[in-house]
From Swiss-Prot:
Transmembrane segments: 45-65, 100-120, 129-149, 156-176, 194-214, 248-268, 298-318, 330-350, 365-385, 391-411
Pfam families: Cytochrom_B_C (PF00032), Cytochrome_B (PF00033)
Cofactor detail note: Binds 2 heme b groups non-covalently.
GO process terms (BP): respiratory electron transport chain
Lineage start: Bacteria, Pseudomonadati, Pseudomonadota, Alphaproteobacteria, Rhodobacterales
Keywords from the named record: Cell membrane, Electron transport, Heme, Iron, Membrane, Metal-binding, Respiratory chain, Transmembrane, Transmembrane helix, Transport
Family: Belongs to the cytochrome b family.
This protein's name: Cytochrome b
Organism the protein comes from: Rhodobacter capsulatus
Positions contributing to heme b b562 binding: H97, H198
Top-level taxonomic group: Bacteria
Length: 437
């Protein structure tokens, strides 16, 4: 897709021209912050800057914490307590880092569901969407390994349970599990590997974020109407857009300030609200916690993992058809990763010609059921695997897959969308009036 017509950077002084011919960094920054942006973006589009800020915050606080952290099973727990008690500002760094992970996932879930509602995954933005899903997977891996580092009870047993999932893969599973752990069980080699990867992966995420931004700068931003910016001429493009600076930067910074106000209130007044008290007990391989619960942002997919127990008919059927190769444990692993994979396949599963859910009445109903379903999965993921939570998680998991694999494809063929505006300018003027009037 050709870019949106707009003014590009033109060096004016001799020094600017000299630098631009050799390293056009000024031009790159100019074209990035002055990019034409659909003028009708609403407040759901502010979470991108929250994610960018939080990523930088996590990297900076993580580097500071790593200075005093010791990745050894005999010293890790004590080194975290040393950071909390003896290092100047150490408690603040740890609480900001721990709660920053929650803010990061909250923002990314809102970002994902906004994309699902407004059709930001549809052509020509498939690459942007897929790169975003890869970033999300790396976030999950990074957060999981980071949760292991304090070496509390939940850290140790969470690592034991999650790494055990790889052992469920037929044939090669035990070898993969041993390779991940560095031995037969979670121990010092595991902690060292997780610390190393936890330090590395945020920089990989940052690189993918740059690609993500590059991708949507190439195709142009989506917007609440799903209508593309007119590219026929610069004059038409200017009627549909505003430069990112200063209009959207100021708006985003204002929203970021409000989000950070709430974030630092949590850090200051209830920093352990989203944590688990068992993680303030040093890891003990001989004492299993009564109820192993991951961090809240893993709960929806943890619920899907546990939903398909051995007595569920589809698990029994698949187990029989595969002669026991795909048992209940492996089926749960497939379901958990499949729940993420179907989101990545949304560009091809959604057959509607209309992008935005704002003009799709039936889609809106099913979408809000999906949001409710996600909340229910988060809730049951924290509950024990007993009646009625097991049945609720199974029903909620079934709807998750049904939405992407059945409902989205059928809606494209059966739904009659509402009329969409001819241009972004028309939509903007219908809400805010014509500036020329």
């Amino acid at each position: 897709m050709s870019g949106i017509p707009h003014d590009h950077y033109e060096p004016k002084t001799g020094i600017e021209k000299w630098l631009h011919d050799r390293l056009p960094i000024v031009g790159l920054v100019y074209d990035t912050i002055m990019i034409p942006t659909p003028k009708n973006l609403n407040w759901w589009w502010i979470w991108g800057i929250v994610l960018a800020f939080t990523l930088v915050l996590q990297i900076v606080t993580g580097i500071v914490l790593a200075i005093d952290y010791t990745p050894h099973v005999d010293l890790a727990f004590a080194s975290v307590e040393h950071i909390m008690r003896d290092v100047n500002g150490g408690w603040a760094m740890r609480y900001i880092h721990a709660n920053g992970a929650s803010l990061f996932f909250l923002a990314v879930y809102i970002h994902i569901f906004r994309g699902l509602y407004y059709g930001s995954y549809k052509a020509p933005r498939e690459i942007t969407w897929i790169v975003g899903m890869v970033i999300y997977l790396l976030m999950m891996g990074t957060a999981f390994m980071g949760y292991v580092l304090p070496w509390g009870q939940m850290s140790f047993w969470g690592a034991t349970v999650i790494t055990g999932l790889f052992g469920a893969i037929p044939g090669i599973g035990p070898s993969i599990q041993a390779w991940l752990l560095g031995g037969p069980a979670v121990d010092n080699a595991t902690l060292n590997r997780f610390f190393s990867l936890h330090y590395l992966l945020p920089f990989v995420i940052a690189a993918l974020v740059a690609i993500h931004i590059w991708a949507f700068h190439t195709t142009g931003n989506n917007n609440p109407t799903g209508v593309e910016v007119r590219r026929t001429s610069k004059a038409d493009a200017e009627k549909d857009t505003l430069p990112f600076w200063p209009y959207f930067v100021i708006k985003d910074l204002f929203a970021l300030a409000l989000v950070l106000l709430g974030f630092f209130a949590v850090v200051a007044y209830m920093p352990n609200y989203l944590g688990h008290p068992d993680n303030y007990i040093q890891a003990n391989p001989l004492s299993t916690p009564a109820h192993i619960v991951p961090e809240w942002y893993f709960l929806p997919f943890y619920a899907i993992l546990r939903a398909f127990a051995a007595d569920v008919w589809v698990v029994i059927l698949v187990d029989g058809l595969t002669f026991g190769i795909v048992d209940a444990k492996f089926f749960g692993v497939i379901a958990m990763f499949g729940a993420i994979a179907v989101m990545a396949l949304a560009p091809w599963l959604d057959t509607s010609k209309v992008r935005s859910g704002a003009y799709r009445p039936k889609f809106r109903m099913w979408f809000w059921f999906l949001v409710l379903d996600f909340v229910v999965l988060t809730w049951v993921g924290a509950m024990p695997t007993e009646y009625p939570y097991d049945w609720i998680s199974l029903i909620a998991s079934t709807y998750w897959f049904a939405y992407f694999l059945v409902i989205l494809p059928l809606l494209g063929a059966t739904e009659k969308p509402e009329p969409i505006p001819a241009s972004i300018e028309e939509d903007f003027n219908s809400h805010y009036g014509n500036p020329a009037e």
